[in-house]
């Protein structure tokens, strides 16, 4: 039986009639006639009404491709129950033992309608159903061809490859895809990993870049930004306060009507709008807003839909106070690069403190600006110590520049990183045949610098694990479904018009590899080259095929190497191109202190301590054995790491390779300048990290700490199996990770001490 429901027809475009034989004739624009055989029908009249047609002849008419159907008519996509039932009995293949399961339960296992948490097979079901429903809705909206049987077969294959962790959507996708966030609210920005915003045009709308960063960060999107707007505007200051006799209750409680009071709504939009009002009051010389925080939920209440628990209004009030304190000192002066970074960092601090997200930011500055280079020198800028940790700081390096001063700073605290914007604009992969200037509009990159981006652009990442495959043929099949997931995400527009203009034109994705160190160890570098070359070629062919089917542009770029972190832990893979710190090490992960995951871990004997950077998180230490024979990062020279990044930039990544090179400050520090002289022509970006084995006590609560076999055995001897089944009696709202799930995106600094914040 074919049913068409909720179809609204415009009286100026459509007329209908019904004859005695049950044939319904609908004239579309008085030209094209579509007929249905039916014994039951409800016809439209002169006004817009519902057309309800049942096809009792069951003739399988393909009606969904007609432009007539302005509302959804294709049945909602769902994987078959009998297919899912087979996986409900299979053990989830989490990597690294308890670590992979902790990360999953902490970050991606949503609470279901029956008030229990998802199991892995259910999370995968939600994600795959969500992916194919995005496709279905796009097809329906644009009158394209949809084959339900073909979709079911394709979705089942995607499901299997995610369940077995041959590829995984990013953490944002694992958490949000198929949830109310995308299905009913349509917040597709939550499926994207990263963004960039330039301050170059700050004069047109001074608060806009800051507001975009805050809104995106609260959706879990990591944001890069530049300082090109410095000196573009004067910080004017606020209008004088109203007369003392004017009482607050006498004022209108809506902004925009020459009034001061703003009741902050208990929503992401409300928090963002409050900051916009405050910034505009200084940039555009408007009234000083008076904020009423009474509508914001109390501390400890759950943040439904986006995960986590509320910390009350205090983080937002603190942000308001800090913005006022910062800008009051700058009235009458041009906005500086320091002002720009400070404002972005203060916003990031609020997002972290508010338990909404872990903010991930990267700042891009002028390599010739000593003011910018010194931002994380807290002897010079002690006032920044409480918030400067919120961004990685990098410079737009110029080809042929003198790297001496930059390298001096890198030796001090590992920053700044370097981004060669000329290379990012000019090349796809870094080979002469791909000097194509596809990204001539690019202005920066994302916080981990694996994606070239235009201003206000978002992009979606997806992660594949070559070492979890037995053959190239199997891996190429995985690439098909990994690509299809990422391409599907580009179908969803966002709430930001500026973003949609770029996103829908570029359709940029980043199909990544993790476990590269493992693959090289077991298969060799030459085989990796073969897989890269063949995989890259296939992705180009797949883009041709699926872009034609969906009637959208081909993706401007498709491949990258992201640093990974939590998602690679699920699959038991080393992160991105990076080698493990050691055969034996301690892995530290951050969990909200209110999380129900903490008691079972403490009961099992795992070490748990407060996180030093804020009062809302605790740090859990987990001993890891990465496997015999795998080379450790400490055994690989700086030059070899740079060579591997260059290899991947040449054979795989047309976006970028996220590469954090660890180095020996004593032996290799003097070579930094010379290394950059060579590799500036082979890379698009790179960052450096002083080797912890030679700089003891530099970092607090690092994500990784090298240990020896003796200490490893001592730790595990005191551990018991963790019983997570008790959590089913106490549902746990997960806390999704920041945009790219990486352990190297957010860097917390305290004087000379730096934290890679997971």
From Swiss-Prot:
Instruction: Tell whether Oxidoreductase is among the UniProt keywords.
Output: yes
Mind listing the GO molecular function terms for this protein? cobalamin binding; nucleotide binding; ribonucleoside-diphosphate reductase activity, thioredoxin disulfide as acceptor; ribonucleoside-triphosphate reductase (thioredoxin) activity
InterPro entries assigned to the protein according to its UniProt record, in alphabetical order? RdRp_reductase_class-2, RNR-II_ins_dom, RNR_alpha_hel, RTP_Rdtase_AdoCbl-dep
Q: What is the active site of this protein?
A: 448, 450
Q: Which UniProt keywords apply?
A: Cobalamin, Cobalt, Disulfide bond, DNA replication, Oxidoreductase, Redox-active center
The cysteines joined by S-S bonds are 194-459
The UniProt record lists the EC number as 1.17.4.2
Top EC class, one word: oxidoreductase
Q: Domain of life, per the record?
A: Eukaryota
Q: Which GO terms describe its biological process?
A: DNA replication; nucleoside triphosphate biosynthetic process
Named cofactor requirement(s): adenosylcob(III)alamin
Region Disordered, annotated ranges? 233-256
Q: Which SUPFAM superfamilies match?
A: PFL-like glycyl radical enzymes
Pfam family example for this protein?
Answer: RNR_Alpha
Q: Does the keyword Oxidoreductase apply?
A: yes
Q: Which PANTHER family did the record assign?
A: RIBONUCLEOSIDE-DIPHOSPHATE REDUCTASE, VITAMIN B12-DEPENDENT RIBONUCLEOTIDE REDUCTASE
Tell me which family the UniProt entry assigns to this protein.
Belongs to the class II ribonucleoside-triphosphate reductase family.
Subunit structure and binding partners: Monomer.
| Protein name per UniProt | Probable adenosylcobalamin-dependent ribonucleoside-triphosphate reductase
State the organism of origin: Dictyostelium discoideum
Taxonomic lineage:
Eukaryota, Amoebozoa, Evosea, Eumycetozoa, Dictyostelia
Annotated gene? rtpR
